[in-house]
């Protein structure tokens, strides 16, 4: 009897659903922990390392906050939202720093089930919320970016807007004071956690205002909600924002009758003018330029040189195939289609769900702006599927028993989640660095000073700074074409030019931090170099760096190290492209060859490689189409780690070299085909 009473209590049922969905989400994320724990190479300092490259930026910031200081101009994320939260968790919990950054995403990202279930409960549809929570918490895209070890702001980047959506819907349905104060609170937290959410928050508030004007134009509380929410978008300090919001909230709560529409209109107009004057639209324009129009700021900042656009090389901002788009959002194409149908049906039944459109549309921008956006559509589409399933159950109950209906719903849910389970099983992401790489960089920390620089590609910038506690020229946040030019040049040109460029780029970068805002050092370091060395032709200046008699006039202020991991060969053609571009035209018109490959087949005395090249089994020549090309030399590498290799000359007039990696330490790269220019590069020679 007592059991039946508990089941009749809607709050206990709701709580049970939240707990079950949360535990389900966490357990699914523990699969990667279980799998990765089998590999010693994924461990450092007695804990699994993280799998997010950008995560090391926040880890560095948290580490510096724990230490209480960081070096000037070291690009540390000291004081950033995720670093701050990590710092406090480290201070108040008994867990190690490595364990905290490993598991934070596991537990925080799973909180997405709470607003999903609460939102569905506002429509008196708990089943809709429960099914949606199960699907959304582990759908391909959301899982990929919030799995264990994925230490990044993505762990709350969907949780927070779903809470905002929940309070907007609750405000529409209940018109309560709790929603009125909670709405700006969560918008403020979201903006602090993820400043790039500004555009989405503006869209949500704007749509809420339009909804108010259409359906609730005579209700004051909705206008006050818009004003309070808009105040969080201002650039003033958070404590001033909070004070103004609390005062206005208190005035409305205590003096509703005296706050007539004229006063509310004046407050709204003043808020709008303040936002415009404080540059409120600038963040929106930046996001549109970077992700939609693929603009590179370096082209705008520099009036002379046209650098390589980094957006052409980032997978996250590449256009995504439509089938992949559907799978990433809902686990499978069929579930996506049912979810879309369910969401349209949900909109017809409950018009307040129109507030979810900005989140859904942002996710659909993945078709143009890149696959990283798909996570936004995940919870909204999951709600559509949950609604469809709840309607399906209502139909079943009319024809069959409750037990039969429940069995059908459970079976359908499991069937829906099966592709997601398969994805989780197959998605075995490696850690960013191996144990050997992390240990090597950790050793460098004991050799180098904090003011020293490591010149490497931007992919490795954050983790290098974290493990070695040094400075870098580029990283995952500083990698415009004008930034990447210098490490690209140092890695892909000859050793003499590499040494000179490494020294110049580091010293000029340090000088740029203290230069006036309108100084050429702030806009283009390369032009500043040319000015100081009395050079007007960029090609002649860069060529002069290869000459032994080139004299560096800039005083040496620190040591410089080069980090050139073997696996960088997989992306080295991209790395080189940044400095082989024609700086006057922006066109890559200086051809070079550097191509990694693995064998696909061997027949008739020929080796068919994955890059389309057909190599003779004696390695003396290769074919591209019908053209037979001679090989200059064969370089057999027995051990990259030990530096054991053998060079066999073949034709000294030929322009191409074949590297044969016997130990195959680099995945998918047993052969490397390169021309003489790449063979003489610092990356290959060193």
Where are these regions (language model features)?
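Start-transfer (signal-anchor) and selected internal transmembrane alpha helices
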Residues: 1-44, 116, 129-130, 245-273, ...
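Membrane-embedded helix bundles of polyisoprenyl
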Residues: 22-29, 104-119, 128-172, 179-212, ...
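Short hydrophobic/aromatic helix or loop-helix immediately within or flanking a transmembrane segment
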Residues: 54-67, 72-96, 107, 154, ...
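Extracytoplasmic
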Residues: 62, 66, 404-478, 549, ...
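Juxtamembrane membrane-water interface segments that cap and precede transmembrane helices
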Residues: 91, 289-335
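Hydrophobic, aromatic-rich transmembrane alpha-helices
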Residues: 209, 247-259, 324-350, 686
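Hydrophobic/aromatic-rich transmembrane helices and adjacent perimembrane loops
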Residues: 338, 354-397
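Luminal/periplasmic acceptor-recognition loop/helix of membrane-associated glycosyltransferases
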Residues: 471-569, 586-634, 640
């Amino acid at each position: 009897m007592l059991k039946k009473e508990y089941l009749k209590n809607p709050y206990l049922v709701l709580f049970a659903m939240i707990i079950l969905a949360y535990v389900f989400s966490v357990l699914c994320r523990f699969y990667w922990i279980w799998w990765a724990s089998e590999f010693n190479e994924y461990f450092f300092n007695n804990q699994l390392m993280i799998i997010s490259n950008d995560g090391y930026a926040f880890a560095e910031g948290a580490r510096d906050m724990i230490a209480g200081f960081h070096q000037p101009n070291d690009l540390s994320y000291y004081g950033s939202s995720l670093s701050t939260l990590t710092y406090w968790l480290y201070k108040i919990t008994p867990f190690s720093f490595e364990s905290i950054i490993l598991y934070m995403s596991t537990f925080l990202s799973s909180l997405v089930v709470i607003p999903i279930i609460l939102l569905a409960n506002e429509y008196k549809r708990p089943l809709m919320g429960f099914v949606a929570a199960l699907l959304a918490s582990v759908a391909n895209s959301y899982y990929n970016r919030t799995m264990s070890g994925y230490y990044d702001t993505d762990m709350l980047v969907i949780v927070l807007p779903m809470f905002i959506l929940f309070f907007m819907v609750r405000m529409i349905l209940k018109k309560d004071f709790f929603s009125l104060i909670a709405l700006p609170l969560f918008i403020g937290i979201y903006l602090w956690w993820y400043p790039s959410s500004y555009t989405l928050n503006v869209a949500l508030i704007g749509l809420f205002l339009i909804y108010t004007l259409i359906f609730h134009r005579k209700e004051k509380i909705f206008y006050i909600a818009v004003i309070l929410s808009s105040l969080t978008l201002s650039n003033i300090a958070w404590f001033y924002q909070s004070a103004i919001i609390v005062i206005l909230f208190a005035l409305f709560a205590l003096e509703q009758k005296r706050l007539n529409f004229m006063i509310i209109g004046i407050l709204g107009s003043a808020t709008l003018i303040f936002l415009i004057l404080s540059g409120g639209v600038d963040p929106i324009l930046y996001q549109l330029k970077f992700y939609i129009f693929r603009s590179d700021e370096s082209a705008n900042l520099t009036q002379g040189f046209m650098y390589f656009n980094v957006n052409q090389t980032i997978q996250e901002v590449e256009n995504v195939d439509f089938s992949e788009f559907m799978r990433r959002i809902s686990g499978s194409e069929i579930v996506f289609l049912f979810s879309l149908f369910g969401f349209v049906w949900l909109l017809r039944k409950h018009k307040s769900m129109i507030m979810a459109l900005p989140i859904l549309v942002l996710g659909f921008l993945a078709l143009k702006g890149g696959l990283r956006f798909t996570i936004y559509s995940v919870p909204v589409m999951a709600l559509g599927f949950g609604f469809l399933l709840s309607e399906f159950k209502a139909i079943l109950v009319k024809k069959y028993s409750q037990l039969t209906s429940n069995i059908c719903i459970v079976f359908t849910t499991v069937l829906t989640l099966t592709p997601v389970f398969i994805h989780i099983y197959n998605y075995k992401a490696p850690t960013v660095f191996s144990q050997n790489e992390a240990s090597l960089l950790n050793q460098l920390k004991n050799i180098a000073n904090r003011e020293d620089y490591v010149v490497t590609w931007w992919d490795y910038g954050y983790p290098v700074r974290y493990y070695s506690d040094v400075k870098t020229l580029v990283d995952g946040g500083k990698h415009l074409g004008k930034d990447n030019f210098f490490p690209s040049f140092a890695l892909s040109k000859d050793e003499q030019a590499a040494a000179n460029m490494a020294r110049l780029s580091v010293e000029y970068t340090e000088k740029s931090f203290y230069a006036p805002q309108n100084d050429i050092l702030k806009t283009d370091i390369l032009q500043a170099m040319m000015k100081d060395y009395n050079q007007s032709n960029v090609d002649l200046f860069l060529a002069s760096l290869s000459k032994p008699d080139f004299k560096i006039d800039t005083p040496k202020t620190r040591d410089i190290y080069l980090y050139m991991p073997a696996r960088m060969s997989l992306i080295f053609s991209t790395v080189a492209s940044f400095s082989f571009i024609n700086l006057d035209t922006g066109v890559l018109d200086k051809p070079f060859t550097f191509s990694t490959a693995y064998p696909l087949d061997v027949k008739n005395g020929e080796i068919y490689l994955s890059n389309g090249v057909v190599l003779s089994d004696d390695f003396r020549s290769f074919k591209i189409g019908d053209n037979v090309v001679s090989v200059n030399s064969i370089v057999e590498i027995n051990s990259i780690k030990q530096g054991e290799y053998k060079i066999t000359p073949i034709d000294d007039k030929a322009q191409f070299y074949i590297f044969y990696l016997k130990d195959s330490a680099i995945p998918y790269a047993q052969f490397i085909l390169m021309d003489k220019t790449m063979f003489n590069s610092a990356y290959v020679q060193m």
